[in-house]
């Protein structure tokens, strides 16, 4: 008989029939029964049980007449692997079986069933019906054997409307009883309640021991594998996302804790008058935080612009950021929710919360920082007031550096975009709101130095160098706007060579734009004694003269853009102009149809400029556009057969293309 039984069960139904039969009348020894149950457990771990099978096994587990001993029943509970979403009625049945006296079901079995319920909580088909039994579960908190499991279930189920005044009083009274002061399970529930009403549950509570039940990861993994096989169209990530969706929110709902006939909850408002009355009665910081969920209330808050509201909001933020977000391991999603809310708040808010300043620094000490939360935090940082102490700015940028140095160039590129946005916000500040100009310039200097350090760390990557040039362009625009005569931060020489030696005009033009801004800043201040800028611009011109003959027409165009603002620096331009103009094979190779006339028009204009300023100055030994270069242009344009017709048609062509200044200059030359 035993050799036949050792072959195992053909299917789940056969196993359940055998279990029911032997629970009423044992047909074998306990050792044989245990071996058969282990075979059944192995089968269940492979195929799982449907709701009907789970319900049938619960009949055996909860039966007072069963002949199975405690070990057999506990093994049966481990067999409850679901292969589909579990109905809430099964969970309600387990809660209904709880017996404070342990007569219907022993405390050990009740604890095992509650533990199973925690393990399958994310596989329930909902929790709306289960929430109706919240009070029943809360009643069993006083039972030491069941408390770890009851507390965990309550933490999972708790919503804002569950946190009532009487429950807060009962929970705190239970925690203060002798022997319960260090209870981690009660503390976990207290901290959950504190998230919803930090203004009611005051004081600090810290863990000595983590107050959660240890989950059997292998059992959960086996369950997920079964569910995945049973339902190919539902990926495993569905279960984890469902779990995250049920995670309690740190942001209170739009309700008041107590409502009377003369007051309204924020959800019940129907008129502006009612909204005004409710605002006047807002007392608790958590209610201020709840207001942030509604754009209408948020705008109303800014219109009221009362300091008492901002101070209460800051108080809620202090508790939420320093206590709520550190409550459990899954707090990254809660943190993302809070940071999203704060980002929307700061888009309109005239005031930056003080508690957020400290949290920004402590954020980087977290062991697991998600990229989404990091991006949100950096966006918040761009709203930090410029009146904030410079030492804080310096500390913040140091934290950024340590964090980014562990990443790659792509991550650094995203960070430089944030720095650009930060400087752009500073540029768009009204002059009156800029406060102390020296403070603003000090912040800009810190940001540009920080960006330069990061780009140099990543070996002057081309894309990063381009972003750095954009940062310096904003920096010089800010300097020009506030008209503050200072010795500015000069871009490093490495930036010159990295961008000028690129084959793309995109990078060269960014460098030219920066060079023009530095010159403009010098001219706006009307102070040529700023040696730093003079040295800076001359170093660029020297670099340009070194590489321009190695380039094609892109470098020539850059040269021409710089001609007019820097024509007084003839010592830098004269060698380049002479070389380009007299090297016709080179000119034919690099000149475009618009570049060549533009270049020669500037050369002629420069000669006129020299004659006017210093008549003793000789002319540049220059060969003008003549028939020698006509062949190269004619092959491109196919406009005329004669040099005279070519000149006329070429002027018409330039006008069509919008080069009016060049065409007018050439036309005046022809007329002469």
Swiss-Prot record:
<comment type="subunit">
    <text>Component of the inner kinetochore constitutive centromere-associated network (CCAN) (also known as central kinetochore Sim4 complex in fission yeast), which is composed of at least cnl2, cnp3, cnp20, fta1, fta2, fta3, fta4, fta6, fta7, mal2, mhf1, mhf2, mis6, mis15, mis17, sim4 and wip1. Interacts with cnp1, sim4, mis15 and mis17.</text>
</comment>
<keyword id="KW-0132">Cell division</keyword>
<keyword id="KW-0498">Mitosis</keyword>
<dbReference type="GO" id="GO:0005634">
    <property type="term" value="C:nucleus"/>
</dbReference>
<protein>
    <recommendedName>
        <fullName>Inner kinetochore subunit mis6</fullName>
    </recommendedName>
</protein>
<dbReference type="GO" id="GO:0000939">
    <property type="term" value="C:inner kinetochore"/>
</dbReference>
<dbReference type="GO" id="GO:0000775">
    <property type="term" value="C:chromosome, centromeric region"/>
</dbReference>
<dbReference type="GO" id="GO:0000779">
    <property type="term" value="C:condensed chromosome, centromeric region"/>
</dbReference>
<keyword id="KW-0158">Chromosome</keyword>
<dbReference type="Pfam" id="PF07778">
    <property type="entry name" value="CENP-I"/>
</dbReference>
<dbReference type="GO" id="GO:0000070">
    <property type="term" value="P:mitotic sister chromatid segregation"/>
</dbReference>
<keyword id="KW-0137">Centromere</keyword>
<dbReference type="GO" id="GO:0034080">
    <property type="term" value="P:CENP-A containing chromatin assembly"/>
</dbReference>
<dbReference type="GO" id="GO:0031511">
    <property type="term" value="C:Mis6-Sim4 complex"/>
</dbReference>
<dbReference type="GO" id="GO:0051301">
    <property type="term" value="P:cell division"/>
</dbReference>
<dbReference type="GO" id="GO:0000776">
    <property type="term" value="C:kinetochore"/>
</dbReference>
<dbReference type="InterPro" id="IPR012485">
    <property type="entry name" value="CENP-I"/>
</dbReference>
<keyword id="KW-0131">Cell cycle</keyword>
<dbReference type="GO" id="GO:0034506">
    <property type="term" value="C:chromosome, centromeric core domain"/>
</dbReference>
<comment type="similarity">
    <text>Belongs to the CENP-I/CTF3 family.</text>
</comment>
<keyword id="KW-0539">Nucleus</keyword>
<comment type="function">
    <text>Component of the kinetochore, a multiprotein complex that assembles on centromeric DNA and attaches chromosomes to spindle microtubules, mediating chromosome segregation and sister chromatid segregation during meiosis and mitosis. Component of the inner kinetochore constitutive centromere-associated network (CCAN), which serves as a structural platform for outer kinetochore assembly. Required for the localization of cnp1 to the centromere.</text>
</comment>
């Amino acid at each position: 008989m035993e050799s036949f039984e050792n072959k195992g069960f053909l299917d789940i139904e056969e196993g359940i029939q055998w279990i029911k039969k032997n629970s009423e009348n044992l047909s074998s020894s306990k050792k044989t029964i245990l071996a058969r149950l282990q075979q059944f457990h192995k089968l269940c771990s492979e195929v799982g049980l449907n709701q009907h099978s789970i319900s049938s096994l619960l009949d055996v587990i909860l039966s007072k007449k069963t002949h199975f001993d405690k070990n057999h029943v506990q093994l049966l509970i481990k067999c409850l692997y679901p292969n589909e979403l579990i109905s809430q009625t099964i969970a309600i049945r387990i809660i209904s079986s709880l017996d404070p006296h342990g007569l219907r079901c022993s405390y050990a079995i009740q604890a095992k069933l509650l533990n199973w319920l925690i393990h399958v909580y994310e596989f329930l088909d909902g929790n709306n019906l289960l929430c109706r039994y919240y009070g029943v579960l809360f009643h069993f908190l006083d039972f030491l054997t069941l408390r770890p499991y009851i507390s965990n279930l309550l933490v999972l189920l708790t919503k804002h409307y569950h946190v009532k005044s009487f429950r807060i009083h009962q929970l705190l009274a239970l925690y203060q009883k002798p022997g319960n002061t260090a209870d981690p399970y009660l503390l976990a529930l207290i901290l959950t309640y504190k998230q919803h009403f930090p203004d009611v549950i005051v004081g600090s509570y810290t863990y000595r021991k983590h107050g959660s039940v240890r989950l059997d990861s292998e059992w959960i993994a086996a369950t997920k594998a079964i569910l995945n096989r049973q339902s190919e169209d539902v990926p495993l990530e569905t279960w984890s996302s469902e779990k995250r969706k049920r995670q309690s929110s740190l942001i209170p709902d739009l309700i008041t804790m107590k409502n009377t006939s003369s007051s309204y909850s924020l959800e019940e408002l129907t008129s502006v008058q009612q909204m005004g009355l409710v605002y006047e009665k807002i007392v608790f910081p958590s209610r201020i935080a709840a207001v942030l969920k509604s754009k209408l209330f948020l705008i109303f808050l800014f219109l009221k612009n009362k300091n008492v509201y901002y101070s209460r909001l800051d108080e809620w933020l202090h508790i939420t950021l320093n206590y709520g977000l550190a409550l459990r391991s899954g707090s990254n999603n809660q943190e993302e929710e809070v940071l999203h809310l704060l980002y929307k708040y700061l888009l309109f808010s005239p005031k930056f919360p003080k508690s957020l300043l400290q949290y920004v620094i402590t954020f980087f000490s977290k062991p697991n920082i998600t990229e989404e939360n990091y991006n949100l935090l950096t966006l918040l940082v761009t709203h930090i007031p410029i009146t904030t102490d410079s030492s804080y700015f310096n500390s913040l940028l140091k934290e950024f550096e340590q964090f980014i140095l562990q990443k790659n160039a792509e991550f650094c590129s995203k960070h430089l975009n944030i720095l650009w946005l930060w400087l752009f916000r500073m540029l768009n500040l009204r002059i009156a709101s800029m406060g102390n100009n020296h403070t603003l310039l000090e912040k800009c200097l810190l940001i540009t130095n920080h960006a330069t350090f990061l780009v140099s760390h990543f070996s002057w990557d081309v894309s990063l160098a381009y972003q750095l040039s954009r940062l310096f362009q904003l920096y010089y625009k800010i300097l020009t706007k506030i008209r503050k005569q200072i010795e500015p931060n000069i871009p490093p020489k490495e930036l010159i060579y990295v961008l000028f030696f690129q084959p793309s005009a995109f990078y060269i033009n960014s460098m030219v734009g920066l060079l023009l801004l530095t010159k403009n800043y010098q001219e706006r201040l009307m102070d040529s004694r700023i040696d730093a800028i003079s040295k800076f611009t001359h170093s660029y011109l020297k670099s340009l003269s070194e590489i321009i003959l190695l380039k094609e027409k892109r470098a020539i165009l850059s040269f021409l853009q710089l001609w007019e603002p820097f024509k007084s620096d003839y010592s830098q331009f004269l060698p380049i102009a002479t070389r380009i103009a007299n090297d016709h094979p080179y000119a034919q190779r690099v000149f475009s149809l618009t570049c060549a006339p533009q270049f020669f028009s500037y050369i002629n204009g420069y000669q006129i400029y020299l004659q006017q300023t210093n008549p003793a100055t000789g002319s540049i030994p220059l060969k003008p556009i003549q028939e020698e270069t006509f062949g190269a242009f004619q092959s491109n344009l196919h406009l005329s057969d004669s040099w005279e017709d070519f000149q006329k048609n070429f002027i018409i062509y330039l006008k069509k293309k919008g080069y009016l200044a060049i065409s007018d200059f050439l036309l005046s030359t022809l007329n002469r």
